[in-house]
């Protein structure tokens, strides 16, 4: 912000031109066009450097650019992808994380029961990756769970998308 004109060096100006969400060292910042030339990822990194801190991009690549579009960033291992079927952005969790979650159970619990819970959560997360990815992996999940004493409840792709739409208020449940 040190390069910003005096009118923009206030919290009022910051709040009027910047929307920011942050968790630990991960952040997502939307910057208005009006201030993007003097408040962007490069100037933020410079400001941090002036106070002895290092600011990195989420990939820790060291190749920072002034700004990127929503579809070019990730936040807390979630990307922002436009979904043509639903005509909106979805925030799928990194596919590697989704697939890995079924391999881990914490605590002193029934291993099969916790694995089923993880698979059900993973199946929902797969639905955020699109129909083709979902169908590919859910078929594998069903094949693996045939030997389980208890069976996971796997919805169809469309059912997961419907449930998610109700959950986030894009549809009103017929039950209400």
Regions found by a protein language model. Give the residues of each.
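Core nucleotidyl-transferase/polymerase catalytic module
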Residues: 1-176
């Amino acid at each position: 912000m040190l390069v910003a004109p005096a009118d923009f060096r206030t919290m009022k100006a910051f709040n009027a031109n910047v929307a920011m969400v942050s968790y630990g060292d991960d952040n997502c910042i939307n910057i208005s066009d009006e201030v993007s030339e003097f408040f962007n990822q490069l100037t933020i990194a410079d400001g941090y450097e002036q106070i002895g801190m290092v600011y990195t991009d989420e990939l820790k690549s060291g190749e920072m650019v002034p700004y990127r579009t929503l579809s070019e960033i990730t936040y807390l291992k979630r990307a922002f992808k436009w979904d043509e079927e639903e005509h909106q952005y979805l925030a799928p969790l990194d596919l590697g994380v989704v697939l890995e979650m079924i391999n881990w159970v914490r605590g002193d619990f029934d291993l099969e029961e916790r694995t089923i819970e993880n698979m059900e959560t993973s199946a929902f997360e797969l639905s955020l990756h699109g129909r083709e990815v979902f169908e590919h992996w859910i078929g594998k999940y069903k094949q693996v769970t045939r030997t389980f004493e208890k069976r996971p409840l796997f919805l169809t792709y469309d059912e997961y998308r419907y449930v998610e739409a109700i959950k986030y208020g894009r549809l009103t449940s017929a039950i209400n």
